[in-house]
C-alpha cells in the first residue's frame, strides 16, 4: 500500500502523486456505494503494481474542502476577480470570501483586467482595494494587471503552499497562471460578447507544480450559490463583524435589527464597507430561505 495526493481527477480516473511518481488509479466500487467522492488535493492510500493501473483504497481525513471549486486540503486561495469584462461584482467576491473563511482557508484577492479601466474607474477601484485591505485581506492590484510587482508579491505568498485559483469564468485564472509559470501554456479564452461571460477554458481540476507551490487551476463559474452554514454562523465569516461582535449589547447579535449593535454603529461611521454589509444582508436572507442540506 502507498500514500499520496490526488493531483488530477478526470473521467473516473485519479492521478496520484507519490514518491516523485504519478500513478493512474480508479476508485474501488464501494466508494460509490458509501457516497464517497475523491477530489483533487485528497491525501489517500492506494495500491498499484505499476504507474498505469492502480486502485484507490482510502481517503484520509480532510482539513478542509471547497465545493466550488471541488478541491481539498487547501492552504490558500487566490480569488482572481475581474474589474471589467465581466464587470466587478463585490457580491460574487464576498460569496467566495465567505466560503473560504468557513473552511479556514486564507484568501488573497487578485484584481485582473485593470488595464481596461479608465483613470476615473481606477480611482474608484482603489477605494474598494483599501476597503478589503482594512479588513485584513491581502489585495494585489496593478495596472497593467500582470506586472512584475504584483506577480513577485504573489510568488512570495504562494511559496510552500497548496493553493487553489478560483473566480468567475473569464476572470483570468489561467492567464495569471501562465504569467507565474509561462511553460504551462494553459488554454485561455476571451469573453463571449453575447453573454459577457468567459468560455470555460479549464475543464478539469488538477494540481500543478508552480515554483515551490502546488496550484489547482479549476473550471470557472458564472454564479456562486453555495452557503453551507446557518444564519448564526454567517457573521463569523465576515472578519470585520467578528472583531466588533464582543462590543454588541446582545450575545449572538446578527447585526440586523438588534439595538446597540457595534457593527451597525461602525457602518454608520464609515468603518465598514456599505457593499459588504449589503451583501451580508442578502446572504443572510438567502441562507434563511434555503433548505438545510449542508453537511457539518
UniProtKB/Swiss-Prot annotation:
Q: Could you give the cofactor binding note from the entry?
A: Binds 1 zinc ion per subunit.
GO: which molecular function terms? GTP binding; GTPase activity; metal ion binding; rRNA binding
InterPro entries per record: G_CP_dom, NA-bd_OB-fold, P-loop_NTPase, Ribosome_biogen_GTPase_RsgA, RsgA_GTPase_dom, RsgA_N
Q: What's a Pfam family in this record?
A: RsgA_N
Q: Which GO terms describe its biological process?
A: ribosomal small subunit biogenesis
User: Where along the chain is GTP bound?
Assistant: 112-115, 167-175
Localized where? Answer: Cytoplasm
Please give the chief subcellular localization of this protein: cytoplasm
Arranged from A to Z, the UniProt key words for this protein are: Cytoplasm, GTP-binding, Hydrolase, Metal-binding, Nucleotide-binding, Ribosome biogenesis, RNA-binding, rRNA-binding, Zinc
UniProt cross-references to PROSITE patterns, sorted A to Z: ENGC_GTPASE, G_CP
Query: What cellular-component terms does GO give this entry?
Result: cytoplasm
What is this enzyme's EC? 3.6.1.-
Q: Which cofactor does it need?
A: Zn(2+)
Top-rank taxon: Bacteria
Q: Where in this chain does the record put each CP-type G domain?
A: 63-224
Q: Where does Zn(2+) bind?
A: 248, 253, 255, 261
Q: How does it assemble?
A: Monomer. Associates with 30S ribosomal subunit, binds 16S rRNA.
Question: What PANTHER family does UniProt report for this protein, alphabetically?
Answer: SMALL RIBOSOMAL SUBUNIT BIOGENESIS GTPASE RSGA, SMALL RIBOSOMAL SUBUNIT BIOGENESIS GTPASE RSGA 1, MITOCHONDRIAL-RELATED
What is the purpose of this protein? Answer: One of several proteins that assist in the late maturation steps of the functional core of the 30S ribosomal subunit. Helps release RbfA from mature subunits. May play a role in the assembly of ribosomal proteins into the subunit. Circularly permuted GTPase that catalyzes slow GTP hydrolysis, GTPase activity is stimulated by the 30S ribosomal subunit.
Family label: Belongs to the TRAFAC class YlqF/YawG GTPase family. RsgA subfamily.
Cite the HAMAP family for this sequence: GTPase_RsgA (MF_01820)
Q: What is this protein called?
A: Small ribosomal subunit biogenesis GTPase RsgA
Protein source organism: Limosilactobacillus fermentum (strain NBRC 3956 / LMG 18251) (Lactobacillus fermentum)
Its gene is rsgA
